[in-house]
Amino acid sequence: GDPKVLVTSLRGTLTEGVDYRGDRLAAAAVCGVPIIDTSSPRTRAVKTAYDRRFGADGRGGRSGFETALTVPAVRKARQAIGRVIRGPDEVGVRAFVDARYARESWDSVRGYLPPAEREEFRPVSPDMLGYGIEQFWSSVGTDR
């Protein structure tokens, strides 16, 4: 049928529990880093527990914020873009639409991606995104 766009939250089953095999899903874009509400009492309690266990400055490896919020957020984002390519013969576009995935800085999440993914992803400026996607589909011999 005609091309379609699905917009959903990263907290729903469409980004984790549905298998889009074959050409059912050609691309996925995660806009932002899906960190949950940091002000909720539960979130603050979990963060505090991790801070007490590992040290607020990450002495034990990671801070409470990283362990309670950042790591699960990056895991959710990776799970969502993983919906695109489910087998060795599938191709698709996977995009993280947030500079924090690409650059090294105090608020970067790049270090939470596996090394192979860090190498695979290519930062693209917004004005070149359309061109980059067209070039990708041309290179794999598919018109999407």
Q: Can you describe what each PLM-predicted range is?
A:
Residues 1-144:
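ASCE RecA-like P-loop NTPase motor cores
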